[in-house]
Amino acid sequence: MRELALQGGRYPEVDMAFALNQIAGWQTARTKLPSWAECADIIYPPHLSMEQCSSEQTALYKASLVEKGVSMTDLTGGFGVDFSFIARRFSSATYVERLADLCDIARRNFEVLGLHHADVVCGDGVDFLRTMKPVDFIYLDPARRDLNGSRTYALEDCTPNIIELRDVLLEKARTVMIKLSPMLDWHKVVDDLGCVSEVHVVSVRNECKEMLVVLRRDSNAPLRCYAVNDDETVVFRASDAVASTVRLVSDTSEIRRGSYLFEPNASLMKLGCFGLLCERYGVKKIGAHSNLFIADESVDFPGRKFQISTVSSMNKKELRRNLSFITRANIAVRNFPISSQDLRRQLKLKDGGDTYIFATTQGERNHLILVAGKV
């Protein structure tokens, strides 16, 4: 890329800025949008739009949630990735985007992708919403950056303001899906919007990517939550999570060699349904603020699973005796008074290997070092 940019003067007939942008976009698409990267005629947008667009994996997940219907509208079109997958579920699909350049790109790409039923509208999504005919489904991905380009995390600070538009959205469609930042408090989102029937927290390779909120007109069904991590999905009713009780380890003696250690995946961490995990999987939480769980038996837990080989206090002699055979380890701290870097220096261990060390707290002040291997 850099060499090509430096040689731009040798090819005056080539729009070098455009060419470099297409190469960079394709390189990103190879991992983010593999089916698009295989299509030679796709046009890629500027870097920010590529950075902000959904991945193919998360777009496919959204499409899987949508019932087949007659008509849908995406009010915040962007690069059009989500639209391109969801639109295949409908006979008629409208993409709305205020930036003319993105509309031109979308119009071309939709033809290339065989979405001949897609209608591209260049205009403001809110203005279009107020005058559009009712449809079966509306999708929005509100902007989460302010005028200065800084990220915003409050629902009311997103553009457009979904809270203000809720009623008109539900007048125009029976079902509305909104993509939000996973940084938002999902409890507050539900309270702010009302009419929420589903909350999906979607992770890819245990990295939280997005929160999806589904609103349905006149729905009396209980709120359901979906913790998604790649092909693994945990579903529960929000009311069941509220009614569940966290089971805590009452004494350090319950944490011993041979015990199984579990760490929930990123989506479950975000949803925070820890009591439900205790009841559903028969595990106990090590501490009130330590989001690690143990059990005597191995269970099919949604997250990382380890088996403990050594349990140690922070006593120097005990540490020396228990960790003398370890030269390198992956170190994680969970509710612990020092950082993983400081602990690594204190234990004089190199990074990596097959050994995992979890530093955590049982009870109020019982600091523990758990040495474990992945199962």
State each model region's role.
Residues 1-375:
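SAM-dependent transferase fold signal centered on methyltransferase-like domains
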